[in-house]
């Protein structure tokens, strides 16, 4: 079965791991995500993952409540490592070799982030999960995803969310909101469509890395994305606005 990509970076929000629980990690949701990733790995596609931590702790929210912003962001980084280790466990229990690499040294728990080692793991068919964000406060995990994608030469970023693409307005508030099939980086930035934060979009634009935004809750969508099926919204430099 042919695939459209050789190496992809999958961006998972922390919220994607909590399902309908409202907080924390839903083991069944993580299991389903792991099974989808295993199916994609079986096609020969290399997968790296950046996972958020918003299901456990949100640094921006804590900072707005009075916590020191840098401290809040570091706590959020630790939350991403908890999610990374949970996903690693779920993947390895179904036979998918997985390595967690963290931007902050946690030698008893994970490898340090080393670009060449990460690429070597991918070449050997292992999943690599990047935890602890970029290791720096004031940067989002979306920006980390763009940075890591550029570093490992990923061909695309899959941003798996709870909505089925990018809309011109919040579809939960405006039922008639229009979903885009494709967008340019410039339009996303000009219209502040919040596909990712502006730093992440700028990094993707500079390095010509397309972003596919799609619904993770629909079973099989990761595989569909890899096969090039028409799902979600594609953001890129040469995309038409439609």
UniProtKB/Swiss-Prot annotation:
This is Uridylate kinase. InterPro entries: AceGlu_kinase-like_sf (IPR036393), Asp/Glu/Uridylate_kinase (IPR001048), Uridylate_kinase (IPR011817), Uridylate_kinase_bac (IPR015963). GO terms for biological process: 'de novo' CTP biosynthetic process; UDP biosynthetic process. Its EC number is 2.7.4.22. It catalyses: UMP + ATP = UDP + ADP. GO terms for cellular component: cytoplasm. The gene is pyrH. Homohexamer. Pathway: Pyrimidine metabolism; CTP biosynthesis via de novo pathway; UDP from UMP (UMPK route): step 1/1. Residues 19-24 are annotated as: Involved in allosteric activation by GTP. ATP binds at residues 11-14, 54, 58, 161, 167, 170. The keyword ATP-binding applies. SUPFAM superfamilies: Carbamate kinase-like. Allosterically activated by GTP. Inhibited by UTP.
């Amino acid at each position: 079965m042919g695939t459209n990509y050789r190496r992809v970076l999958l961006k998972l929000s922390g919220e994607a791991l909590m399902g309908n629980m409202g907080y924390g990690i839903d083991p069944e949701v993580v299991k389903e995500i792991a099974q989808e990733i295993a199916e994609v790995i079986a096609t020969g596609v290399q997968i790296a993952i950046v996972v958020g931590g918003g299901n456990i702790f949100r640094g921006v929210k804590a900072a707005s409540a009075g916590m020191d912003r840098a401290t809040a962001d570091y706590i959020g980084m630790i939350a991403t490592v908890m999610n990374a280790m949970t996903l690693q466990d779920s993947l390895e229990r179904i036979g998918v070799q997985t390595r967690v690499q963290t931007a902050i040294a946690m030698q008893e728990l994970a490898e340090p982030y080393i670009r060449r080692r990460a690429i070597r793991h991918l070449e050997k068919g292992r999943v690599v999960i990047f935890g602890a964000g970029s290791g720096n406060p004031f940067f989002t995990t979306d920006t980390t995803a763009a940075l890591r994608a550029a570093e490992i030469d990923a061909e695309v970023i899959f941003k798996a969310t709870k909505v089925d693409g990018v809309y011109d307005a919040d579809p939960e508030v405006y039922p008639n909101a229009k979903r885009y099939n494709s967008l340019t980086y410039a339009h996303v930035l000009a219209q502040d469509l919040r596909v990712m934060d502006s730093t992440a979009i700028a990094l993707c634009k500079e390095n010509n890395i397309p972003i596919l935004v799609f619904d993770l809750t629909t079973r099989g969508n990761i595989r569909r994305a890899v096969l090039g099926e028409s799902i979600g919204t594609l953001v890129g430099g040469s995309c038409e606005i439609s």
